[in-house]
Amino acid sequence: MTTQNFLAEIGTEELPPKALKKLATAFAENVEAELNQAGLSFDKVEWFAAPRRLAVKVLGLATAQPSKEVEKRGPAVSAAFDAEGKPTKAAEGWAKGCGITVEQAERIATDKGEWLVHRAVIEGQPTKNLLVGIISQALAKLPIPKTMRWGDKTEQFVRPVHTVTLLLGDELIEGEILGVASGTTVRGHRFLGEREFQISHADQYPALLKEKGSVVADFNERKALILAKAQEKATALGGVADIEEDLLDEVTSLVEYPNVLAAKFEERFLAVPAEALVYTMKGDQKYFPIYDKDGKLLPHFIFVSNINPEDPSKIIEGNEKVVRPRLTDAEFFFKTDLKQRLEDQLPRLETVLFQQQLGTLRDKTARIEQLAGEIAKQIGADETKAKRAGLLSKCDLMTNMVFEFTDTQGVMGMHYARHDGEDEEVAVALNEQYMPRFAGDELPKSLVASSVALADKFDTLTGIFGIGQAPKGSADPFALRRAALGALRIIVEKNLPLDLSDLVATSAKLFGDKLTNSNVVEEVVDFMLGRFRAWYQDEGIAVDVIQAVLARRPTRPADFDARVRAVSHFRTLDSAEALAAANKRVSNILAKVEGKISSEIDRTLLVEAEEKALAEQVITLQAELVPLFEKGEYQTALDRLAGLREVVDNFFDKVMVNAEDPKLRQNRQAILNNLRNLFLQVADISLLQ
């Protein structure tokens, strides 16, 4: 089979930088899927993405679909011919549909008799006839939330399309995609290299684009170049560049031919908290800040230009000029805010609604203050400090700095609290109350901060559920899913002795008569336990393990986690499958019992050796495992219970549970009931698959 390399490039106006990488990888994945669906073999699909183009290059693409043999079965021979041996109308209709006569059909013998059959070989189409459709479909399936039209065209895409290049080897694949006819014209950099040039072979891409058009089409190549040069520039300045992956991807998406440069700002701005300076450098300007070896911000930054003049001084000066007003604003806001104590902002919180039915931010801080104090008492934190941090928790939202630079909430509260002479634990808690801010983020370090973070999250969860506004579908305006998962992470990873039901009930009381949902405790707890499911699935823990623990509805997160870890370990044991099946069998047997099942095992009613053996082991384990259950040592307990496999198997092999004698039957049911209850102290093992 012959193969060729295939190139498809879509030349556009500037694509959304935050979406570029996602669009490019999705384009490649879609092309791969379409090729597979068409039955076209290939070696590899490479993707390229720059601000004004999306491209894929398919290596080793078969130049034609493989031929395939098809078999069309017709009517049974007995129904295909009449008594005189002439073809019936059914046979003739089938044959006509196949493009043959009845006489040309083959016959096959089956266990149900003899049938007419037509076998044919369908030749595969040339690949070049399929490529326009494949690329069109791949583009149509891109994850584009909002499309646009341009000119007088009816076609829609994320941005206007100007060129389409489709080359199978050196052959131009003619066709129209998104209203643009394919050709061999490729556009280069807006300001460097050739604006337009011709490409004659798929193999010339992307090298020719870099050589003639001054465009580095390979996203990962540009990204690596920016990273290396930024680190090199920072090192030369005696520091380390702060290069976050998301910002690096965004900057990579903004330039076609990256030119990495370093610039500076006045040292006086370093008197402003670094977080505010970094916020504007990263968020507004897409710059990379530089820190010294001790983690202190240096008065330098890295930026990436899309042009490469011999003398970059003008570009550097321009960027320094652009960032100066933003830093001046931050300096002004900071100095203005310092004229008031953080506590002086409390009255202003009364002017800002948290939620119409739940009151103002001042109401919320009062609740957080009380709840943080209660939590602090339970986890051994300083109650006074926790309450103080709770009281001040939202004051920085009223400051000029946070109003202008919203992402500095919390961290500016910390800086202002320090300036006011607040206790260090209180100040740090004002920042850490929002942790974890996203999946994988760090947790509050101190117990005081943990108390405030939990109080804030439980206040929001309880309040919003308490007025019947639980998240529906993907809508979650109060970020309740994130709040629930964050609270669970804090409790579990810090092994805090807290109960969800108690926390929600305590929180609910602080709302007075504002809540209208009488089931708020159960609903919030169920919601949070549901977030456990997502958390553990992300960790790769089997769904049946999570279901087994959820069936017991433990409401202490640290305890829930211990059970999940124990059951996950138990599931790997050789005896797990048999004991899970046995528990399922026990559940089915006991479910059919009418009336109450006794929990007392009468030794005088033990007849068979196998039931005696099981009963004795169950009775012994009941005494031995109680201390383990009380201490939450579930894995050790399940390891001990795993040793029951043989006696359980023997019991079911040799003992008739539903004996005719009612006393024997009830006693055997009691044995099984006690056996099941031992496992249920941890989880419902019968749910393991």
Swiss-Prot record:
<dbReference type="GO" id="GO:0005829">
    <property type="term" value="C:cytosol"/>
</dbReference>
<comment type="subunit">
    <text>Tetramer of two alpha and two beta subunits.</text>
</comment>
<dbReference type="GO" id="GO:0004820">
    <property type="term" value="F:glycine-tRNA ligase activity"/>
</dbReference>
<protein>
    <recommendedName>
        <fullName>Glycine--tRNA ligase beta subunit</fullName>
        <ecNumber>6.1.1.14</ecNumber>
    </recommendedName>
</protein>
<keyword id="KW-0067">ATP-binding</keyword>
<keyword id="KW-0030">Aminoacyl-tRNA synthetase</keyword>
<keyword id="KW-0547">Nucleotide-binding</keyword>
<dbReference type="InterPro" id="IPR006194">
    <property type="entry name" value="Gly-tRNA-synth_heterodimer"/>
</dbReference>
<comment type="similarity">
    <text>Belongs to the class-II aminoacyl-tRNA synthetase family.</text>
</comment>
<dbReference type="InterPro" id="IPR015944">
    <property type="entry name" value="Gly-tRNA-synth_bsu"/>
</dbReference>
<keyword id="KW-0648">Protein biosynthesis</keyword>
<dbReference type="GO" id="GO:0006420">
    <property type="term" value="P:arginyl-tRNA aminoacylation"/>
</dbReference>
<dbReference type="GO" id="GO:0006426">
    <property type="term" value="P:glycyl-tRNA aminoacylation"/>
</dbReference>
<keyword id="KW-0963">Cytoplasm</keyword>
<dbReference type="InterPro" id="IPR008909">
    <property type="entry name" value="DALR_anticod-bd"/>
</dbReference>
<dbReference type="Pfam" id="PF05746">
    <property type="entry name" value="DALR_1"/>
</dbReference>
<dbReference type="Pfam" id="PF02092">
    <property type="entry name" value="tRNA_synt_2f"/>
</dbReference>
<dbReference type="GO" id="GO:0004814">
    <property type="term" value="F:arginine-tRNA ligase activity"/>
</dbReference>
<dbReference type="GO" id="GO:0005524">
    <property type="term" value="F:ATP binding"/>
</dbReference>
<keyword id="KW-0436">Ligase</keyword>
